[in-house]
């Protein structure tokens, strides 16, 4: 099994030569549930910049995210993987209005990618054809918007993010075809994996998604990101998955660092704990505890990759 896995891995990653990039998913609310302002975002980014200068978000209009985060990211030299929430028409229209209002106030280079939807297919909020239509809608919209220096956002790719298992399902193909870039989410915790199997499961999920996308795009030379992955440090167990600082540290080294060593770009979920979230999602009480740092910016475990 290991020989077969390594052979498949080598085939999928033939074009990879360098360490994969690191990004962090970033929450937009304070511990008390209020929305972060420009100065708070600047503080977050100033703290993160020694580790990464790429952040990922989920919506444009919610909490005035682009209005406040855009200027902060530009001031701190960050790029945003900017999420756009497409699931209902009213929300989608608010997202488009925010893009039109606030993209002109920042430089085009501040936006790394527009990501239409976050697991919209996994949750069955949209069909693949509906998501494809909204991806194309955003492509058309941003072509007509210019940044503060007069350059068009047409140069910025428009993609989507979804769970790895949905992406390998043939039903997702219309959305994959419409997207310039597709990010794949994978959480060994939510698959009830034991710690002994967690990193192997992560690699297998990611490679299946990458191979599917390479086949769909007709090339091994594609931009690819793991859009979310991580391990909770507290809360209840889920099957054989046990939240703890030790297990999160282990998954960082054996999963996240190892993926990056193979040249896979990873957006970690998430930078900071989000204390405002509910104690339980109805499945497991881990929602507050995914951060690499506590909400007060105390590091929980080493994130230096140790290849020894």
UniProtKB/Swiss-Prot annotation:
Top-level taxon: Eukaryota
Subcellular location: Secreted, Cell wall
Enzyme class: hydrolase
Signal peptide: 1-18
Catalysed reaction, written as an equation: Successive hydrolysis of beta-D-glucose units from the non-reducing ends of (1->3)-beta-D-glucans, releasing alpha-glucose
Gene Ontology cellular-component terms listed: cell surface; extracellular region; fungal-type cell wall
Protein name from the UniProt record: Glucan 1,3-beta-glucosidase
Organism this protein belongs to: Candida albicans (Yeast)
Lineage per the UniProt record: Eukaryota, Fungi, Dikarya, Ascomycota, Saccharomycotina
């Amino acid at each position: 099994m290991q020989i077969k896995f390594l052979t498949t891995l080598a085939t999928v990653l033939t074009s990879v030569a360098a360490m994969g990039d690191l990004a962090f998913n970033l929450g937009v609310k304070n511990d008390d549930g209020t929305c972060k302002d420009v100065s708070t975002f600047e503080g977050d980014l100033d703290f993160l910049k020694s580790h990464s200068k790429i952040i990922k978000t989920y919506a444009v209009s919610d909490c005035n995210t682009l209005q406040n985060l855009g200027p902060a990211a530009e001031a701190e030299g960050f790029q945003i993987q900017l999420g756009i929430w497409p699931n209902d028409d009213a929300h989608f229209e608010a997202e488009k209005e925010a893009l039109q209002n606030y993209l002109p106030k920042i430089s085009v280079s501040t936006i790394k990618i527009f990501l239409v939807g976050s697991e919209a297919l996994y949750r069955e909020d949209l069909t693949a054809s509906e998501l494809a239509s909204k991806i194309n809608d955003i492509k058309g919209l941003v072509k007509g918007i210019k940044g503060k220096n007069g350059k068009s956002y047409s140069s910025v790719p428009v993609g989507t993010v979804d769970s790895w298992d949905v992406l390998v399902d043939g039903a997702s193909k219309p959305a994959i075809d419409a997207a310039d870039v597709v990010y794949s989410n994978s959480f060994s915790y939510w698959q009830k994996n034991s710690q002994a199997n967690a990193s192997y499961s992560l690699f297998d999920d990611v490679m299946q998604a990458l191979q599917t996308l390479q086949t769909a795009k007709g090339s091994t030379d594609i931009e690819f990101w793991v859009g979310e992955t991580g391990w909770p440090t507290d809360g209840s167990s889920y099957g054989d998955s046990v939240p703890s600082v030790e297990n999160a540290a282990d998954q960082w080294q054996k999963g996240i660092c190892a993926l990056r060593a193979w040249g896979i770009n990873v957006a970690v979920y998430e930078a900071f704990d989000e204390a405002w979230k509910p104690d339980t999602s109805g499945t497991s009480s881990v929602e507050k505890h995914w951060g690499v740092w506590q909400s007060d910016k105390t590091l929980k475990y080493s994130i230096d990759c140790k290849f020894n």
